[in-house]
Amino acid sequence: MVNYPNGRSQSYSAVPKKQKTLTGLSVAKKGAPKSKSLVAFGKRGMNFEAEINATNDYYLSRGLAVIHKKPTPIQIVKVDYPQRSRAKITEAYFRQASTTDYSGVYKGHYVDFEAKETHQKTVFPLKNFHEHQIVHMSNVLAQRGIAFILLHFAALDETYLLPSSYLITFYYEKNGLKSIPLAYIRENGYKIETNHIPRIPYLEIVNKLCEVQ
């Protein structure tokens, strides 16, 4: 039996001043209709984490990047020994992850990121982030690694990449705010237009982040 800690989410987890456009990345303008070619996550039968994993598998198969999801640490509580040579775990608990969801290498750069999902329409709750994750991303940036967060607004079917530097700044200077406004994310992050293959083409943005390292 495996138990999740209480409160653990099973999903992942001001007006913009500028719009950003990258090669191969379409940035939607405010009020612009969504492309009919886009398909909602739910309609494809995959959740946000599965979409990212499928994208990482695609990148790996094409030799573009090596990025994997970090395993969730487990604390074993009870073990039975039905046979002398075999052990059976009968009770265990998922422990809180100490860093972020994903890490790997892209073009010689260390890449580290967290993926979160919300059903809110105008804000992203800060409670989805723990201080030890903020500290970890700060340490990655200090070593000149690439760190960011992928944020999916399920109700809007919108996905953004926000460089960790903006999350860290907002986290420590939030002035009592408990959520990150969507406007802040749109202003400082990049909107990702989902594709069929790869699902979430975030490397197009990471490539830009590498150029300004």
UniProtKB/Swiss-Prot annotation:
It catalyses: Endonucleolytic cleavage at a junction such as a reciprocal single-stranded crossover between two homologous DNA duplexes (Holliday junction). It comes from the Bacteria. Its cofactor is Mg(2+). Keywords: Cytoplasm, DNA damage, DNA recombination, DNA repair, Endonuclease, Hydrolase, Magnesium, Metal-binding, Nuclease. The record marks 116 as: Transition state stabilizer. Binds 1 Mg(2+) ion per subunit. Its EC number is 3.1.21.10. GO terms for biological process: chromosome segregation; DNA recombination; DNA repair. Pfam families: RecU. It is found in: Cytoplasm. InterPro entries: Resolv_RecU, Restrct_endonuc-II-like, tRNA_endonuc-like_dom_sf. GO terms for cellular component: cytoplasm. SUPFAM superfamilies: Restriction endonuclease-like. Mg(2+) binds at residues 99, 101, 114, 133. GO terms for molecular function: endonuclease activity; magnesium ion binding; nucleic acid binding. Endonuclease that resolves Holliday junction intermediates in genetic recombination. Cleaves mobile four-strand junctions by introducing symmetrical nicks in paired strands. Promotes annealing of linear ssDNA with homologous dsDNA. Required for DNA repair, homologous recombination and chromosome segregation. Belongs to the RecU family. This is Holliday junction resolvase RecU.
